[in-house]
C-alpha cells in the first residue's frame, strides 16, 4: 500500500513539475547559456572544490563508486580515474529532455572495457530535495548515483550558473581531484563528448 501511494505521489509530482517547466515557471534556474548551440563547453583545468556527499544507501551505488560503509565522501575518493559530474534540476526542461542521452552516455562507458572502471558518472540536483532527486531518478530511470543540493551550497562552489552543466574531474581514489572540463548547457554527441573527456584527462 505504501509503495502504491508513493508511486502515485511521484506521478502527480512529476506531472506538476513537467507542466511548470514547460510553462517557463522555472526558467530563471534552467537555461542554456550563450555560446555554441548546446551552450558553452571548454577545457577548464584547475582546482575542483572540496565538498562532501552522503555515501549512497544502496549497495549498487556504493559498489559503482567503490565506496563502503556510511557517512560522507569526497569526489576524489571515488574509485576511478575520471568522474563526470552532471549538475541538473528536477524542474529543468533541458535536463529532462537530455536525461535519456546522459543515460546512454553512462551505458556507453559501461560497455567499454577500457573505460568501465576508469570513468564514473554522478549527478547533483541543484536546489533539489532528496525527494525531488528520487522523483527525477525514478521518472527518467537514471542508472547512476544522484545527490541532492537543496541549499545550492555545492552548486555555488562549482560555479554553476545554469542547468545542465557537466564537469570532468580527474581523481585517484585517495582524495586528490582536479577539474579538466566544464561545459554549460549539455552536449550534442555522446561519443565526441566522451572522446574529449578522455583526451583532457589524459586517460
Walk through the language-model features, giving the residues of each.
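Bacterial N-terminal signal peptides that target proteins for export
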Residues: 2-13
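Conserved redox-active cysteine motifs that mediate thiol-disulfide chemistry
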Residues: 87-104
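Short, internal strand/loop/helix patches
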Residues: 136-172
Amino acid at each position: 500500500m505504501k509503495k502504491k501511494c508513493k508511486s502515485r505521489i511521484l506521478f502527480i509530482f512529476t506531472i506538476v513539475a513537467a507542466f511548470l517547466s514547460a510553462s517557463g515557471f522555472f526558467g530563471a534556474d534552467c537555461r542554456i547559456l550563450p555560446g555554441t548551440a548546446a551552450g558553452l563547453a571548454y577545457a577548464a583545468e584547475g582546482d575542483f572544490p572540496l565538498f562532501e556527499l552522503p555515501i549512497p544507501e544502496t549497495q549498487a551505488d556504493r559498489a559503482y563508486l567503490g565506496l563502503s560503509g556510511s557517512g560522507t565522501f569526497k569526489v576524489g575518493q571515488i574509485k576511478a580515474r575520471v568522474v563526470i559530474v552532471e549538475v541538473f534540476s528536477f524542474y529543468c526542461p533541458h535536463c529532462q529532455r537530455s536525461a535519456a542521452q546522459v543515460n546512454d552516455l553512462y551505458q556507453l562507458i559501461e560497455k567499454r572495457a577500457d573505460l568501465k572502471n576508469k570513468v564514473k558518472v554522478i549527478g547533483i540536483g541543484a536546489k533539489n530535495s532528496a525527494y525531488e532527486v528520487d522523483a527525477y531518478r525514478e521518472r527518467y530511470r537514471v542508472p547512476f548515483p544522484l545527490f541532492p543540493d537543496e541549499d545550492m551550497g555545492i552548486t555555488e562552489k562549482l560555479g554553476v550558473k545554469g542547468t545542465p552543466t557537466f564537469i570532468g574531474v580527474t581523481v585517484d581514489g585517495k582524495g586528490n581531484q582536479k577539474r579538466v572540463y566544464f561545459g554549460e548547457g549539455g552536449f550534442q554527441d555522446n561519443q565526441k563528448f566522451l572522446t574529449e573527456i578522455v583526451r583532457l584527462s589524459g586517460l
